[in-house]
From Swiss-Prot:
PANTHER family, per the entry: GEO05313P1, MICROTUBULE-ASSOCIATED PROTEIN JUPITER
Primary site of residence: nucleus
Organism from which the protein derives: Drosophila grimshawi
GO cellular component: cytosol; microtubule; microtubule associated complex; nucleus; spindle
Subcellular compartments: Nucleus; Cytoplasm; Cytoplasm, Cytoskeleton; Cytoplasm, Cytoskeleton, Spindle
Residue positions, PTM Phosphothreonine: 41, 102
Protein name: Microtubule-associated protein Jupiter
Pfam assignment, any one: JUPITER
UniProt lineage: Eukaryota, Metazoa, Ecdysozoa, Arthropoda, Hexapoda
Record keywords, A-Z: Cytoplasm, Cytoskeleton, Microtubule, Nucleus, Phosphoprotein
Region annotation (Disordered) ranges: 129-174, 188-207
Similarity comment: Belongs to the MAP Jupiter family.
Purpose of the protein: Binds to all microtubule populations.
Example GO BP: positive regulation of microtubule polymerization
Length: 207
């Protein structure tokens, strides 16, 4: 038969001491039930909401290399650099092919001529051989469009005479040709009504 000392409960030796409480879930820092000092290492919890756009993880290079496949010869921990030219077997054996240097196009520069430099604008239009505003080689700028519109107004004002702008009655058809009023039916005199009411009345917003 076993002695009583062999079956003593562990709590009998800790009668005068305060009970250790579990402050965290099992597996946490203070769940040591045997009283030995465990090394206090902080738990590595990954924040799922954190963005890693600007700084890569420690394991990102290793995961990236594994994901890219075995045909890419990277050492583990060697991340491929952004903007690095791909190295193929031809360039490794024979070197880079000599390419002619072409100047880069300035995409932010406008091709619309502005300002007082009309000679350069006309030269540009002559090179393009296009028609702008119905005239070949004309400068498409704010000042020229304003002057051409006022010129057109002067021409149109000179050709106008008294008449109805909606129906066209009373305008000159040609040089001195007037629209002749037709004789009234049944041989009576034609009555010219000068007080005409426009279609829809005066309150229609057109007059």
């Amino acid at each position: 038969m076993a002695t009583y000392a062999a079956f003593k409960h562990v709590e009998l030796y800790n009668v005068g001491k305060a009970k250790k409480r579990v402050l965290r879930a099992p597996g946490g820092g203070s769940s040591d039930i045997f009283g030995s000092d465990m090394p206090q290492t902080p738990r590595n919890v990954k924040n799922r909401m954190a963005s890693n756009i600007f700084s890569a993880d420690k394991d990102a290079a290793q995961k990236n290399n594994v994901r890219q496949g075995a045909h890419r010869f990277y050492f583990i921990g060697d991340a491929p650099r952004r903007g690095q030219k791909p190295v193929d077997s031809y360039s490794r054996l024979f070197g880079e092919p000599a390419r002619p240097i072409t100047p880069g196009k300035n995409h932010m520069k406008s091709s619309i001529p502005f300002g007082q430099n009309t000679n350069a604008a006309q030269q540009l239009l002559a090179n393009n051989k296009g028609k702008y505003n119905g005239k070949s080689g004309s400068v498409s700028s704010a000042s020229s469009s304003v002057s051409s519109s006022t010129e057109n107004l002067k021409i149109n004002v000179g050709n106008r005479s008294d008449g109805n702008p909606v129906t066209g009655e009373g305008y000159k058809a040609g040089g001195n040709d007037y629209i002749q009023p037709t004789a009234a039916m049944n041989g009576g005199n034609q009555v010219i009504n000068k007080n005409r009411v426009p279609p829809g009345g005066y309150s229609s917003g057109l007059w």
